[in-house]
Amino acid sequence: MAKEKFSRNKPHVNIGTIGHVDHGKTTLTAAISAVLSRKGLAELKDYDNIDNAPEEKERGITIATSHIEYETEKRHYAHVDCPGHADYVKNMITGAAQMDGAILVVSAADGPMPQTREHILLSRQVGVPYIVVFMNKADMVDDAELLELVEMEIRELLNEYNFPGDDTPIVSGSALKALEEAKAGQDGEWSAKIMELMDAVDSYIPTPVRATDKDLLMPIEDVFSISGRGTVVTGRIEKGVVKVGDTIEIVGIKPTQTTTVTGVEMFRKEMDQGEAGDNVGVLLRGTKKEDVERGMVLCKPKSITPHTKFEGEVYILTKEEGGRHTPFFNNYRPQFYVRTTDVTGSITLPEGTEMVMPGDNVRISVELIAPVALEEGTRFAIREGGRTVGSGVVSKILG
């Protein structure tokens, strides 16, 4: 009998495994799918299936990522796992796989390692809001005190990066042992630990707010003048809903303007409203065509503001990815492509950093020559003469 399709009537959450190389991220991903598949909540995925991750291109950057899906009693999950450390860095910075929360895998035998720290920092920088911890390889540690010590270290590390370390759920277990149990058709103590982990994920990582329930944000792609009707701006609604009669703001590049929506159209048909994901034309009352341009955004009043200065976490493409062949230095002036337009800006490198090489990821400060609607979490590309040389995310607004 064919396995029935996953039901879509449960809330959907995006998560991923993060942590140091060889601490068991991929084994845990396989174990979750194996244990849940015994309950009819997932399709069994082999370790090798997950580890041989297909390469994807996101904004010209090659990233190897495995996507699996599974369910718990309460939710439907899409889970990302990356084979290499560089893939995580690229994935998190480009937002190729947005995560509503992450499972941090730490080997109980080794404790936190350099990439453990780096992934927690990246999660903080790119806005992964919640972390649940799986202390893996607990079968290799006989000393209960040692387990407690590792748990304390993890909590301190989370606190250091402004995650609530003291309240974070930490479940210890063995992904490999759970995988072996599930494959042997048993529900043993290690499988129970995987279920305990998924219960923690279910309860600790909140269901994300749907895009349609957020404040309106629509990047403007084009502007037309329709005689006798006024100015129409077109674009894809990123979040929220736009309705006829709404008061909205036009933000970015020029001083902020306030106007009223007099019409919404999709595929040349009049609509009462457009919502997140729709490509629409929005008719604006009393707005002149020359006052609006590509790169501005339509938004709910006061929900997003224009800025020229920000801090960002960026990944610089390698030569093989079509990026620069040479490093860049302080005061480098590329274009920053935010949503629909390029704005020139100058880069200030962190103290003690002389230059940035292709393939590096680094925290930079940027000053743009024109204000753009920005908030923490806004993604951008760094371009030079129309080609992408880097990808980034706003981690902090400076002015």
UniProtKB/Swiss-Prot annotation:
It is found in: Cytoplasm. CDD domains: EF_Tu (cd01884), EFTU_II (cd03697), EFTU_III (cd03707). Residues 19-26 are annotated as: G1. Residues 136-139 are annotated as: G4. Residues 81-84 are annotated as: G3. It comes from the Bacteria. This is Elongation factor Tu.
